[in-house]
């Protein structure tokens, strides 16, 4: 069920999984190790803004320590309704740098926080293939979390750690939570909770 509280929309009656900062960074390094142990050596790493960006940073750092240098960048996707107002279209921003740099013998890793519908990742890969043509590099996808029941594409992530159907609440996320949920599950903002409460109520 979705309810509105002032300017904010809050989902209730849905099981949430609160991810701690230390768990996410550990999973990011574990994800990088999984990619490395599989023998994949990306020389380009793309972090999908927002959630994939910090994970992408950790993956890039891990590879760097292991002696695998890579160029790295964050890109963004935006969802909007199509002409028929029934289908969701995806627009990708920030790929130009990669498109101009990559060659067919390069290896590219796309990093996101969660693979749910898969529509954004599918669009990113499609845009890369369309723009790069014969220079399209090998492309693989890595994410800590995968939601198979939500996947609307034929693609699954090449690398992932956890399968889940829960509502994932990442360390940086506050929007969509009630004050009570923030108070109970976000110790990082415990010193600010009273000020937050006065502002949004």
Residues covered by each model-derived region:
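PRPP-associated nucleotide enzymes
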Residues: 1-201
């Amino acid at each position: 069920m979705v309810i509105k509280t002032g300017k904010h929309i809050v989902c209730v009656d849905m099981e949430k999984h609160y991810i701690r900062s230390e768990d996410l960074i550990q999973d990011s390094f574990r994800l990088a190790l999984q990619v490395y142990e599989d023998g994949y050596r990306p020389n380009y790493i793309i972090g999908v803004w927002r959630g994939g960006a910090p994970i992408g940073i950790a993956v890039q750092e891990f590879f760097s320590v292991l002696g695998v240098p890579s160029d790295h960048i964050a890109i963004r996707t935006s969802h909007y309704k199509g002409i028929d107002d029934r289908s969701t279209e995806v627009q990708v921003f920030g790929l130009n740098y990669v498109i101009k740099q990559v060659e067919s013998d390069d290896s590219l890793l796309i990093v996101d926080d969660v693979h749910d519908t898969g529509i954004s990742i599918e669009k990113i890969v499609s845009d890369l293939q369309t723009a790069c043509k014969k220079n399209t590099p090998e492309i693989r996808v890595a994410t800590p979390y995968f939601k198979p029941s939500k996947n609307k594409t034929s693609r699954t992530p090449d690398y992932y750690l956890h399968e889940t159907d829960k509502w994932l609440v990442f360390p940086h996320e506050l929007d969509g939570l009630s004050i009570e949920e923030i108070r109970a599950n976000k110790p990082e903002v415990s010193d600010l909770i009273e000020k937050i409460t006065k502002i949004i109520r």
